Every structure is written in structure tokens, then in C-alpha cells.
């Protein structure tokens, strides 16, 4: 388990809340521990980033677990984020390294006929599980679909990865923008 680099929250006067998460160290460490090739490393890093963003959206130091059933050769991807500082995760069947990372490959491997289960843990309540069927798209668009359907909050998620020529992660960061109830939809 690795401590996240940084998470920042912003709230505009127009009623738009933004949470930015940088999980570069956690993504690098996961790539190293699990000996992941580029495609698997980027996908796991993005799922770790999604878990971090979702966990910081909750109150009372809640934790969140993602169970991402890909229906691809990757199998299931697991990620947890808790205490506002920690993330961990793994891929059931990492790819063999012959496929270089591209956004099109990411979408193919994470979303086709897949399902995302999100479990929220709270000190005050019983765990709550919700799920969404995944449409075609990358990791971030699948998380956006989950939030928009499950939380019914107008949201947009972006998660980006930067790798070197050998496929090692250089940077892994993302954000969620959400329209607050008093926010102006025209500005979102």
C-alpha cells in the first residue's frame, strides 16, 4: 500500500466542485510490485486514481473498493482507497506485455461488456454496494458513467497517464468535476 502523492479540492463560486488526485507513486509502486507491462500498469494506475477520487468524495473518512469486471483477458481489477491517504490494487491477469498502451486498447480491455461494482465503507453505516454496466470508453468515462447514474450528480472524470519509452509510469493524475445543487448547468 502506498501513500498518495496529493489530493486537492476546489469549489468555484459558480457551484462547481473539483477534486484533483495525483497517485503517481502508488501507480509506480504497483507497476513495480506486480511486474506490470505498460498496458496493465496504466489501467491499474487509472483504477487506483478513480478509487482515490471516489474515496475523497465521501465524508467521515470513508473507504471505497472498486471491483472492475472487465470480461477481457485482464479478468477483474480490484482497487481500494481509504483513510483519505492510501490506495492499493491488483489486476487478476495482467497482459503479457506485447500490447503497447493506447487509449483505444485501454477502452477495449476495460469496458466491453464489463461491470463496475463500488463498495462504500463508513464508520457510521453498513457497507453499501452499487454497480453499473460499462459502455464503451476508457477508465475515466466508465467512472463518470457510474457517478452520473449511481450518485445522480452531474460529473465528469478525466484520468491521464504519462509513460516513458519502456512503458514505465512517469505520471498518473486525474480529476472529477461535479456540479453542485446550486451550480449553473450552463457553465458545466
Regions from the language model: what does each represent?
Residues 2-188:
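Interaction interfaces in information-processing and related assembly proteins
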